[in-house]
Every structure is written in structure tokens, then in C-alpha cells.
A protein has these predicted regions:
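Predominantly extracellular/secreted and cell-surface proteins with exposed
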Residues: 34-162
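Long terminal segments
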Residues: 107-244
Length: 244
């Protein structure tokens, strides 16, 4: 397959070619690691991404306009946390979380009657939270993380011509301690391990999660209507809440 064909297939799996909104919902856990310490399951994690595609005439691919919200949960009860070790929890409110896709050889693996698209995204860039300004909240002046995605779809669905195909996903993320955890430069960090599904509509998001979003940021039920920059992240959102 050409890079253009691979991107076309991936776009149908990740979103919808007709510009209709798609919602991915995921659930999982967040584990800590640190030298000399056992691995610990600190949080449950649940979230969603509402997205829509539009053609990127300039780049010859697509622009994905999206928002994503995600929540840290009590690992036992799976209730959304408001505090952790007497510190306020800052949940994920990334608006926007846009992507620009240009044709590239998207890794594709046939797994029986399924097709898997894999994305490995190493990140390293100047931290929005310099240690000098945020000594309790920042692990380093360089933000480093690793995002690992797998999107699965039935091969038979992909062989058709529908603009969107059913999909499930897995996501693993290795990152520094979260800013609100106030771990400073302590060695170690977090591993997120989640699985998810493309929903038929936002109405399929668990009711308690929809209620939480509706009471705080109802706009996260929909994808953005227009392209904006820059993207929001947990680090930039924390800086916005806590300017220095």
C-alpha cells in the first residue's frame, strides 16, 4: 500500500472521512515507578476524545480537530478523584488536541481477521513548566514522554467503502510525574495503560462521566468547530491555572 492508501485506511479507523464526529472512549490505570520502589497502581483513568476530520488541501492529508477530557479515578472504587494526598487533582481538559496528518507509511499489521495500525510517538521538547519557576511541579526543563497507540479494526470492514469503520484501541504512555502531584525532581514517573473503543455516539459514554463533563466543561461533548493553535496539554493547562 502507498503512504496515501495507508493514511486513508487509518483515517477511516481513527475517525470518519465524511466529517462526522467520532468519539473514542477509554479506560485503564496509571502505575508509578521509581528506583528501589515497587510498582504501584496509583489511579484508575477514564477519558474520551471527540474528533472530526477535514481535508488538509495544503498538506495533502487530513486535519483532525479534537478535544479530549480524562479523569483520574480512585483505583478501587473507580470514582473520580478531587484530591490525592491532600492535593487537588487536575484532570485532563485538552482543548484543542488537534493533529495534522500527511501521507506516511502508517505501520499496519494483519492479525487474523483484524488489522492493527501502530503509532509510536516519542516526545521531547522544552517543558512548559521550567524547574526554576515550578520546582515542586516539574521533573525537568525538558518534557519527555512516550505515547504508544494501537488501533484495531475488522479487515472485512476496512475492505468496504464506508467512511468510518468500527475500531478498538490500546494506549500506553510513559511520562514524568504529573505537575499536581508535586513530586519535583524525584526520580521515577508514570505509566498509563488503557484500552478503548470507537463509540456510535457521545450518548454511549458512561452516564456518570457525561454528567461530570456537563457540569464543568460541556463543550467537551463535541469536537471543535474550527482549527485553533496551539494544542493544550496537562502541562500547559496546569501553567494556565498556576501562572508564574
Amino acid at each position: 500500500m502507498t503512504p496515501e492508501e495507508l493514511l486513508h485506511a487509518f483515517a477511516r479507523t481513527r475517525a470518519s472521512l465524511d466529517g462526522e464526529e467520532t468519539v473514542f472512549w477509554w479506560t485503564g490505570d496509571v502505575h508509578s515507578w521509581a528506583p528501589g520502589e515497587p510498582y504501584r497502581r496509583l489511579f484508575g483513568f477514564e477519558g474520551l476524545n471527540a474528533a472530526r476530520l477535514e481535508a488538509d488541501e495544503e498538506g495533502g492529508g487530513y486535519r483532525m480537530l479534537s478535544r479530549e477530557a480524562a479523569f483520574y479515578l480512585d483505583p478501587a472504587t473507580r470514582e473520580i478523584l478531587e484530591t490525592w494526598q491532600d492535593k487537588p487533582v487536575v484532570h485532563v481538559w485538552n482543548d484543542p488536541a488537534n493533529q495534522r496528518w500527511r501521507p506516511f507509511p502508517v505501520p499496519r499489521t494483519e492479525l487474523g481477521d483484524q488489522v492493527c495500525f501502530s503509532l509510536e510517538i516519542p516526545l521531547a521538547y522544552p517543558s512548559p513548566l521550567p524547574v526554576a519557576d515550578y520546582p515542586l511541579n516539574s521533573a525537568d526543563d525538558t518534557y519527555r514522554a512516550l505515547e504508544l497507540f494501537q488501533f484495531f479494526t475488522p479487515a472485512a470492514a476496512l475492505a468496504g467503502d464506508a467512511p468510518s469503520v468500527p475500531a478498538t484501541m490500546s494506549w500506553t504512555r510513559m511520562s514524568p510525574w504529573l505537575p499536581w502531584m508535586e513530586q519535583g525532581q524525584r526520580p521515577g514517573g508514570l505509566t498509563f495503560h488503557c484500552r478503548g473503543v470507537k463509540l456510535a455516539s457521545y450518548a454511549e459514554v458512561p452516564e456518570s462521566t457525561r454528567a461530570y463533563i456537563a457540569a464543568r466543561h460541556p463543550e467537551f461533548a463535541r469536537a471543535p468547530e474550527k482549527w485553533t493553535e496551539p494544542n493544550e496539554s496537562s502541562w500547559t493547562y496546569f501553567r494556565r491555572l498556576n501562572p508564574r
